[in-house]
């Protein structure tokens, strides 16, 4: 058994372990990683990795609470282009709606709020995968819409 393995191996095996959907505690994950040869792994490292990769506790097919990585979430990383998280941009006479990948709406809304009024955005409300954008001026909603579309390289 190897005593040290590199970070890429750790990440790959960590994700594979979570896909099994059978580990209900962080200590069980630590034990499984140690069995794979990662002797320097501990609970705090596992906790940080669970956070980093967006792992959640959910019920598996046997109704047991286990850690898993939601497949559809597509957890944004520092290297993820934000434009890939925006799925649709639409509007009516008063509001702009942006649909995102699940879990990405608050990240995108925060970005939109940061550019704010100079770009025609009065404010945003974000759920899990939908953002409502209130334009600064209804008369200029078309300009605000174009600003948002260009920000995310969105083309219909």
Curated annotation (Swiss-Prot):
Presence of keyword Cell membrane: no
Biological process according to GO: L-arginine biosynthetic process; protein complex oligomerization; regulation of arginine biosynthetic process; regulation of arginine metabolic process
Compartmental location: Cytoplasm
GO cellular component: cytoplasm; transcription regulator complex
GO molecular function terms noted in the UniProt entry: arginine binding; cis-regulatory region sequence-specific DNA binding; DNA-binding transcription factor activity
Record key words, sorted: Amino-acid biosynthesis, Arginine biosynthesis, Cytoplasm, DNA-binding, Repressor, Transcription, Transcription regulation
Record Pfam families: Arg_repressor, Arg_repressor_C
InterPro entries (UniProt xref): Arg_repress, Arg_repress_C, Arg_repress_C_sf, Arg_repress_DNA-bd, WH-like_DNA-bd_sf, WH_DNA-bd_sf
Keyword Magnesium in annotation: no
Pathway assigned to this chain's UniProt record: Amino-acid biosynthesis; L-arginine biosynthesis [regulation]
Role this protein plays: Regulates arginine biosynthesis genes.
Family to which the UniProt record says this protein belongs: Belongs to the ArgR family.
Name of the protein in question: Arginine repressor
Organism annotation: Shewanella oneidensis (strain ATCC 700550 / JCM 31522 / CIP 106686 / LMG 19005 / NCIMB 14063 / MR-1)
Lineage, uppermost ranks: Bacteria, Pseudomonadati, Pseudomonadota, Gammaproteobacteria, Alteromonadales
């Amino acid at each position: 058994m190897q005593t040290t393995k590199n970070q890429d191996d750790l990440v790959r095996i960590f994700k594979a372990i979570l896909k099994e959907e059978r580990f209900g505690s962080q200590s069980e994950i630590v034990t499984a990683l140690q069995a794979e040869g990662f002797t320097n792994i501990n609970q705090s490292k596992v906790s940080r990795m669970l956070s980093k990769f967006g792992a959640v506790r959910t019920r598996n097919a046997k109704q047991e609470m286990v850690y898993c990585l939601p497949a559809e979430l597509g957890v944004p990383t520092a290297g993820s282009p934000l434009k890939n998280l925006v799925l649709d941009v639409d509007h009516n006479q008063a509001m702009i709606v942006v649909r995102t990948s699940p879990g990405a709406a608050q990240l995108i809304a925060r970005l939109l709020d940061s550019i704010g009024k100079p770009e025609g955005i009065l404010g945003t409300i974000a759920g899990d995968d939908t953002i409502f954008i209130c334009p600064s001026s209804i008369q200029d909603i078309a300009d605000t819409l174009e600003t948002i579309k260009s920000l995310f390289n969105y083309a219909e």
